[in-house]
Amino acid sequence: MAHIVRRGESFCVVYYYTDKDGKRHQKWETFHQETEAERRKAEVEIGKKKSTLIVPGKITVSELMVDFVNLYGERKWGVSTYSSNLALIANYINPLIGNQPIQSINTRAVDKYIQQLRKTESVASQFRRMADRYLTDQNIERIIKVLKCAFGQAVRWGMISKNPFSNAILVKTPYHHRDIWDAATIRKALEACRDAQLYVAMNLSFACSMRLGEILGLTWNNVHIEPDDIAQDNAWLYVDKEVYRARRESIKALGENSVLHIFDSALKKPTATVLVLKKPKTDSSIRKIWIPKTVAYILRHWKECQEKLKVTDHSYEDHNLVLAQPNGRPCDDRVIEKKFAQLKKQANLPNVVFHSLRHSSATYKLKYSNGDLKSTQGDTGHASAEMITRIYAHILDEDRKIGAQRFEQQFYANPDLRSIKPPAPETAQPRIDLNTLIRQIERSPELAGALAAALKNSSK
């Protein structure tokens, strides 16, 4: 069995085990607190009885992450998730706890690691500058999510007995509503927009609740805007892919089958990233969206302009993209974001990001549909109606207020159904103006006698 030996301020759990070759060894495990040593002693004794004892090895967290990425990530992740998770591992996991043995990571170590993350500065990427100096609670949550999954696989592989990240305590971050434009501001922006490409993108984002990557990945074969469709209010489009800038190493690791199409780089020199067409992250993002007539006519006009370019420009690369560049090549999201920023500055518009148009879209669709969550979810592609409720609860609250007002008008306004009456307005009590009274007494001396008699009677 196991026993505890105290060494200075440390506590050691000592026990014997037999390796796979049948050799017997003595093992010492050191802990800083006696309670941790007692807990480990109990685990060892139970493990030896049930033949499930896992003896700590020398595998470090960074070595575990290599196996985790190779054996799990390459089978389960898409190119965008693969790239972002590799960045989290390289920037915030390996530098901080990569050298620690995985068996040394317990719940106390996890709490200390989370505390350390909150004091860690954000690492900027080649293409994105970090808005916050230190790691946000959302990014810390993403890091812990990766580690929870990795250590879950370590339990499955028999490397550790339990997952220390399962009950990690994270700061619950309240959702901050994104600033959005109202309908009047969006009309003003569209009227001020002189860039045809940006004009189409803004209409698709607002009218169809599309993400920018989905707009850039939309192809003409998924857009149904024939005259008969428009006349019958049946114009629609189908979202099933998006444009994404992926790292070449991610595509190489996952295989080219992980993306639908790889666009050749326009640059002659080698690049670390490349634009690709890929499936959306979630199945709920694949959806059919009906198009308002005006937007359908805008798309028809845009397509006619594209067809003229194809005829006049023999170098046009036809990828069948709706929002292609003038040469037919795919458009990077940074191009649209830059044009959108210029429009805001020129038209003196409130500062919002392009994605806010999608939030404006969901907001007005909830209003126009009297809070129909399922209908709005069908257009936005959110994974669940709960996400709509969480993000747009303030809109639903307004509708609930209106509902209470209608309830009052339709039900309680009937006097036969209401015995409780609203309180009657208080009658203002007459006030005595002392100066006026003195002037009246001076004019009518007999009034003074009458007033004195009245006061005398009231005092009895």
Describe each region flagged by the PLM.
Residues 156, 203, 207, 214, ...:
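C-terminal catalytic core of tyrosine-transesterase DNA break-rejoin enzymes
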Residues 172, 180, 243-245, 380-406, ...:
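Catalytic-site neighborhood detector that most strongly recognizes the C-terminal catalytic loop/helix
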Residues 222-231, 350-351, 370-393, 419-420:
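Short, polar N-cap/turn motifs at the start of nucleic acid-interacting alpha helices
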Residues 225-229, 233-236, 241-286, 295, ...:
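C-terminal secondary-structure termini that scaffold catalytic or DNA-interacting sites
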